[in-house]
Amino acid sequence: MAIIYGLFNLSGSIKGYTFYKDKDGRNMMRKNPGPISDKIKNSPNYEVNRKYQKEFKGCIQFSALCRSAFGSFNQLSDYNFHNSLVKIGKNIMNMDTKLEIGKRSLKLTEHKNKLEEFNFCRKHKFDKLVCISINCKTDRENLKAEINISNPNRIYNIQNKYHFPFFRILLIIGCVSDMFDNPVTDNYEPIVTDLQNSTVLVTGEWYSTEIIPPYHTMTIQLPQSCAKEITNDVNLVLSIALEFGEVYMGQPKKAEYGGGGKVLKIF
């Protein structure tokens, strides 16, 4: 960094350098840190960097695919979990030991456990929010899942710290395709595209937090029109959430906070 004296009155930047005024009004010149973008894009010395950048962009796209599959459950989040999903994508990519860096695949179909049990909230994690026994049955051929929910005990199992009078269970099912390095575009792309709108939401009944609700079953299914797009490279992502409700004009209304959700099953 250098201080410029004399008749100069500069701002902005010249290749490799930035000019600005500090808080005392002095003209300052600073050399930009790190290699310039042209070298990163073209120099053989940064080939490995370019490969890692390419994979990172693929992981960013993986995060977008997941958030699309979560649908409205994204609104439950109490933090920006984009970076967490990018990290999961990178962990899955690191499992590919056959292909070289920059060409490694991102196959969720082979590593479903990396995304299962992913929580949408940090403060209100689903398993701590409501401890209920959930028996999940999946039918990939018919794009369907069924969950049986046992009686939750209000005193011991539901953390209702805001004392809401109602709660309900919701399910959403969406699709996430495996990803690969497309040699034509030299970018990471989903193997199966146009799955962004392939989501279905099922909303359960409102139950009082003061009364133990009955044992009940919830079923969720994608329309059969999606079947032709669901190849072996596509994951069906089933997520579950709990929402609390407050009273509005004598009827239950969704509360804007207090709930939580997670990825229940990938099949």
Regions from the PLM with identified roles:
Residues 93-235, 239-245, 257:
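Charged linear interaction tracts used for macromolecular binding and regulation
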Residues 53, 61, 75, 159, ...:
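Residue-identity detector for glutamine
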Residues 249-267:
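Extracellular fibronectin type III
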Residues 1-124:
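Long, polar/Ser/Thr-enriched low-complexity segments
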Residues 10, 19-22, 48, 190, ...:
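Intrinsically disordered, low-complexity regions enriched in small/polar residues
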